[in-house]
Amino acid sequence: MRSILVIPSFVAVLNAFSLFPKPHDDFKYLITFGDSYTDNGRLGYYGSHQAHGPPPGVMPPEANVTASGGLQWPQYVEASTGATLYDYAIAGATCDNNNVERWAAFMNANYPSIITDEIPSFKADRKTKLYRGVTSANTVYALWIGTNDLSYTGILSDSQVKGTNITTYIDCLWNVFDAIHAAGGRRFVILNNNALQLTGLYRPLSDGGAGDNQFWQNKTLYNQTEYAQKMLEYTTSSNTMIDYGVPFHLLVKNRWPGSKVAVYDIHSLIMDIYNQPSRYLEPPHNVVGYYKHCDVNGTNCLYGPGRLDSYLWYDELHPSNIIASYIAREFLNVVSGRSKYGTYWEHW
């Protein structure tokens, strides 16, 4: 695990802190924001209710098959700790539709974003009995967003709103923290961007990646090697901005007084799985291909070959179910201050 020492007047940590004094003892609530990497079924509610979310105080039913092909990582955290999960993540979401908006034809509307939908839903729920037991001491807030902001339908193809860029997306992360902090949140985990260049979506066809597919229907018309390199640049650059941005805003700008923030390095975790698959996946290990194969319309899907637990990727974009379980396991280590993938900051 990484521990950070900064100017004493701003007081960070000398040793990696735990978000709770004893692992999981006071971990009663997990509140999550994000996209399909975190969504436990919320988009399905919007799809069946004319693009509207649930009424205040109501959490939609959890799905047992998510974008991982099984449970999603917050559900594994919920099961292993007994914590109550309030998952506001919506598949397809960006951080803010005012920066990057993405059309969802099946809803005849844009995908909801964190700023325009998830945070307002969270604020509305806070006024209901749903949040009666939630305190700053017993609740962890987790944010994982960027996959769609940086995507082919976003910044990668220059499809963002005019005048916005990667730094606008990064600023949105801090705005999300502002809203949660104003609502009483003090324990934060931010998950950085996945190694998207390794996904079938962005890996060149010549290197085992997908051709034209449901997420990028005309991929083969582009210079795929160039776009894979751009995605590597975008993910690593944004992750560096996150690494430097958290201590700057927390300690120098005094933006979230009294808070603890852990940066969870998902990118490195996925790279470790990619480079050492035998430690994580069932044989025969497959870190290049993916399990679910559909046509460009997302239909006529075939699965395999082999078992899902042999795969790093479920489809062209999403980590598989077994990877979701590893993300959850390491998340608990991050929360407990025991993870080599965690960098920890505290404002006293």
Curated annotation (Swiss-Prot):
Q: Which UniProt keywords apply?
A: Glycoprotein, Hydrolase, Secreted, Signal
Please give one Pfam family short name: Lipase_GDSL
Write out the PTM section of this UniProt entry: N-glycosylated.
Q: What range does the record give for the signal peptide?
A: 1-16
Q: Which residues are glycosylated?
A: 64, 165, 218, 223, 297
Q: What class of enzyme is it?
A: hydrolase
TM ranges are none
Stated EC number for the protein is: 3.1.1.6
Its name, as the record gives it, is Acetylesterase
